Amino acid sequence: MTAPSQVLKIRRPDDWHLHLRDGDMLKTVVPYTSEIYGRAIVMPNLAPPVTTVEAAVAYRQRILDAVPAGHDFSPLMTCYLTDSLDPNELERGFNEGVFTAAKLYPANATTNSSHGVTSVDAIMPVLERMEKIGMPLLVHGEVTHADIDIFDREARFIESVMEPLRQRLTALKVVFEHITTKDAADYVRNGNERLAATITPQHLMFNRNHMLVGGVRPHLYCLPILKRNIHQQALRELVASGFNRVFLGTDSAPHARHRKESSCGCAGCFNAPTALGSYATVFEEMNALQHFEAFCSVNGPQFYGLPVNDTFIELVREEQQVAESIALTDDTLVPFLAGETVRWSVKQ
């Protein structure tokens, strides 16, 4: 006779960093998020990027059209900051409830970021307006100078961009997204109530050895790149401490298999199907399940000034095998932990 499975009931979570893409990809991936999460901050790095209220309204409608019947899901839209963005357009979108936040991509830091910001000074009027109206700034925190080693780009960003920016605009709310280093974990922990961070499941579960030793694993390749184990451990300790300004942001970033498994593969992990169970596994390993619900469902809304979700979901602790692939028009998607046996999954 088998022992009954352990069940974990939590308030419905939100995903504070998500890529849904567009077209057939969007239609394929949306249900994996909408069946679990109440809301998600949707990244604006389409081609062309989402830089106007009209573009965000249209994109939001395409997302909602892809949500299956019976799923209660609200996409929260973001504006892609560019050197030429009009502060009035940004404020209009925020006041009309279209834009929840704005995203700063340093030019060429990640997928579809060629339109990104060349320098903070170039967008200072926009940032000053955001500070004035209370609009959160979401930051991909890496410098992009060719001479800076890829493993050092986050730490260098803190000292050269993030700290000077926050010193200059002291009332600006900032989310340091997908942090990957001890430097960033310490920086956020020591920051004030206007600084928060998201962390992905892959950066909590893995380090660069997992990606590079015994063969290259392209489906663990994302940006910011996985770091050495001391950084992974610092991230795990941050979430396990119950610190309330760090929250769930999967950075789920789907690419077709042929774009990941190539001579010059794309960065991004499609983790939407397995992320929540992955986070639960980490919290269990850290003996910190008492902080799991806050990380997933409470800390994010509190920072954004939004209500928590009023429905609940359950995770069950029983071994399940993750699908090897997911059909995508004329290709496939490879989910995070494909083919592996996982300990926690959302109860259907």
From Swiss-Prot:
GO cellular component term of the entry, any: cytosol
UniProt binding sites for Zn(2+) 1: 17, 19, 103, 251
Source domain of life: Bacteria
Cofactor(s) essential for the protein: Zn(2+)
Entries under CDD domains matching the protein: DHOase
Keyword Hydrolase recorded: yes
InterPro entries attached to this UniProt entry: Amidohydro-rel (IPR006680), DHOdimr (IPR004721), Dihydroorotase_CS (IPR002195), Metal_Hydrolase (IPR032466)
Root EC class: hydrolase
Residues with PTM N6-carboxylysine: 103
GO molecular-function terms, A-Z: dihydroorotase activity; zinc ion binding
Associated pathway: Pyrimidine metabolism; UMP biosynthesis via de novo pathway; (S)-dihydroorotate from bicarbonate: step 3/3
Pfam family for this entry, one: Amidohydro_1
Binding site for Zn(2+) 2: 103, 140, 178
Cofactor binding, note field: Binds 2 Zn(2+) ions per subunit.
Family: Belongs to the metallo-dependent hydrolases superfamily. DHOase family. Class II DHOase subfamily.
Its job: Catalyzes the reversible cyclization of carbamoyl aspartate to dihydroorotate.
Protein name from the UniProt record: Dihydroorotase
